[in-house]
Amino acid sequence: MHKTGIARLTLIIGVIFIVTFIITDYCLSEMFKDYIYQPGTLKPVDSVPKLKAGDQSPDFTLPAVSGEKISLNQYLGKKNVVISFVPAAWTPVCSDQWPGYNLVKNIFDKYDAILLGITVDNIPTLYAWTFPMGKLWFPVLSDFWPHGAVAERYGVLRSNGVSERALFVIDKKGIILYIDVHDINKRPRLEDLVKELEKLK
């Protein structure tokens, strides 16, 4: 009876998590819909890869919306890092993707990982865009000037000057373990990122 009760409770918690994710996703989409620029369907990938799994991740220092400067090297030996490049503020998929990471912060914590969100937008634009999302738990960084320099270094700068929708998972030694240069028109599945986080030590 006790085992049955635990199994039932686990099932209920799982259902609540899924429903919460769906509702949150819908509410965020509704909240932004009147302010979102609709670019139409874009070429899925428009960049030349420069890095691969096993490479050392290039260091960078970028300004954050919070006012501080964030360097990748400050996490060396301390944290695993996930870099999330998104193309642009005020676009449909990007406006859903980053708030979704709030739902899995506990998984990042479990695997001693930090998320760094990067776009080529300037700080005022990023502030105006992310403020209505509520409290994002991760640093939001501007790769505005020199324009797209970090995206270029990581091989994810598109020909039109925005970055790809890309994820890089980097271990505490600064080694790239996983790269997903995603179809720019689609949001990467959270489940896939969670699987990669589960491989971290």
Please annotate each region the language model reported.
Residues 1-63:
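N-terminal targeting signals for export/organelle localization
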Residues 57-58, 80-82, 164-166:
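Short loop/turn microsegments at loop-to-beta-strand junctions
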Residues 95-136, 146-150:
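Structural microenvironment flanking redox-active thiols in thiol-disulfide oxidoreductases
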Residues 162-201:
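Thiol-/selenol-based redox modules, centered on thioredoxin-like
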Residues 71-101:
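Short active-site neighborhood of thiol/selenol oxidoreductases, capturing the structured segment around
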Residues 139-143:
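Short acidic-hydrophobic, aromatic-tinged amphipathic segments that line or gate anion-handling sites
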Residues 137-138, 156-168:
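Structural micro-motif
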